[in-house]
Amino acid sequence: MNYLTILLCNRKPTMLSRRNKEKSQHKEGVVGKYMKKDTPPDISVINVWSDQRAKKKSLQRCASTSPSCEFHPRSSSTSRNTYSCTDSQPDYYHARRAQSQMPLQQHSHSHPHSLPHPSHPHVRSHPPLPPHQFRASSNQLSQNSSNYVNFEQIERMRRQQSSPLLQTTSSPAPGAGGFQRSYSTTQRQHHPHLGGDSYDADQGLLSASYANMLQLPQRPHSPAHYAVPPQQQQHPQIHQQHASTPFGSTLRFDRAAMSIRERQPRYQPTSSPMQQQQQQQQQQQQQLQHTQLAAHLGGSYSSDSYPIYENPSRVISMRATQSQRSESPIYSNTTASSATLAVVPQHHHQGHLAVPSGSGGGSLSGSGRGGSSGSVRGASTSVQSLYVPPRTPPSAVAGAGGSANGSLQKVPSQQSLTEPEELPLPPGWATQYTLHGRKYYIDHNAHTTHWNHPLEREGLPVGWRRVVSKMHGTYYENQYTGQSQRQHPCLTSYYVYTTSAEPPKAIRPEASLYAPPTHTHNALVPANPYLLEEIPKWLAVYSEADSSKDHLLQFNMFSLPELEGFDSMLVRLFKQELGTIVGFYERYRRALILEKNRRAGQNQNQNQ
């Protein structure tokens, strides 16, 4: 027992507060941690993983005031280089860019073992490094695999270096032009023995790609055999200025040198004079086609400007293949409006428009050589027929074309448009045609559009039907009243008779097997189920009582259909009461009239 009490007394408490732990650590010292003796006393040891979140906001504040940020190496013992500010020194390192950094500063390589210099509120301007020193610094950077650089600070300083306000040492002369393209290259470290040649290879590829990109628009339009002579490669290239900054390399182009280079062709054609003449003739033919097409289209449709809602190549290819495919009756009017292209005589001439016969995409500006081609005038009229809705139905256009050429015929769906049996339009209605020639109806009264005629079967009132008889023709019959008429029921009230002075006579309906319903109100309005039920006595008492007693009733005990039934019963009671009141006054009025007539008769008898 004594042994257990001794153990419990000597045992230290397991739950210590954070403050007691810190005091014990200060008293006993740091145990189990190794610290180098050559670490300068002015640099504090900061745990990056614990202070990363706390220092992130301070880093953003420091990045917003980027002129006060500088690059300083910590020391030779610690191989981590950071961008420090005057007020604080953040240690926020970008994980993905830890091994992909720009070349170091010149003074950091000349003095690798120097202590950090005091920071200044302005950005230091460093002279550019020559290419051989830049490659050496990139080699040293690739061999050092433990460099950590703040990536956000690098991006902000890189934008400052690329801005025209801070470019003082490597900016071109004022007369050279204002075109400068600066970019920064970021090297990725791989193995130590591959770090030295990566920048040279990337720089060569980038310069070659920029040269090709600038030379692409200068290629001739027509294909020919080209050869690259060796003396052509010795011409002065685009004036490039390489300047290595503490954050990357900058490539700049001179406008004067670019203008000289652009005037020179990339390749010298080795074609004969005959081929050169043919090329010139082809270019003249293309220019002539453009001018003729613009003249025929009136300046509204050029070779490279079309409305957004239509594809010109699809339109032309559709017109070229109209005779090979079948159209639906809805869009059959399009065939008639575009069939004029097949009637125009075809020629192989340079001033005509090339229309491909296949299903591929065609163009309004063709080469003019070979293939089936129609006239530009025919194409312009077909394009205008698409975008301008015709004021007359397409059947009239088809009829005019058929009379002139003798090869066009009416489509059956178009014949129905001109038939005299078509129903007349009510007042306020009009017809119009779509871009494809389909007819639709406009209701100016309601500001709506409809595909169907307003007086068709869908527009019949309730109880009416359309009857087609061999004896009497087409007429409309009212199933409830037995009335029959030729005019549409909706058109009867405001129909204007233009064919004859008298309206048409009523037609006797034929005997049909259909029997009209006996109760007319059932077809129009559903019957109220509470019209014939007996009214409860308590509801009659409630109708005669004062409205101040309504709180005595518990309406929550009834369902919604029952309440609706009680409401209809109350309406019945109120109508009965109204009839009683009106009947009383009507009897009194009739009694007054009788008494008045009696006295008037007596006065007449006395006067006689």
UniProtKB/Swiss-Prot annotation:
- Region of interest: Disordered: 17-37, 64-145, 157-202, 220-243, 264-293, 345-425
Give the residue spans that cross the bilayer: none
List where Low complexity composition bias occurs: 160-172, 229-242, 275-289
**Ranges annotated as biased composition (Gly residues):** 358-373
Alphabetically, the GO molecular function entries are: molecular adaptor activity
The keyword Repeat is annotated on this UniProt entry:
yes
Span(s) of short sequence motif Ferm-binding motif (FBM): 32-38
Q: Which biological process annotations from GO are given for this protein? A: apoptotic process; hippo signaling; imaginal disc development; Malpighian tubule development; negative regulation of cell population proliferation; negative regulation of multicellular organism growth; negative regulation of organ growth; positive regulation of apoptotic process
Record keywords, A-Z? Apoptosis, Coiled coil, Phosphoprotein, Repeat
**Comp. bias regions, Polar residues:** 64-89
Where in this protein does the record say Phosphoserine is found? Answer: S413, S416
Q: Which residues form the SARAH domain?
A: 552-599
The protein's name: Scaffold protein salvador
What's in the GO CC field? apical part of cell; apicomedial cortex; cytosol
Keyword set includes Isomerase: no
* Function description: Plays a key role in the Hippo/SWH (Sav/Wts/Hpo) signaling pathway, a signaling pathway that plays a pivotal role in organ size control and tumor suppression by restricting proliferation and promoting apoptosis. The core of this pathway is composed of a kinase cascade wherein Hippo (Hpo), in complex with its regulatory protein Salvador (Sav), phosphorylates and activates Warts (Wts) in complex with its regulatory protein Mats, which in turn phosphorylates and inactivates the Yorkie (Yki) oncoprotein.
- PTM comment text: Phosphorylated by Hpo.
Task: Cite the Pfam families for this sequence.
Answer: WW
Q: Which residue numbers delimit the WW domain?
A: 423-456, 458-491
Compositionally biased tracts (Basic and acidic residues): 22-37
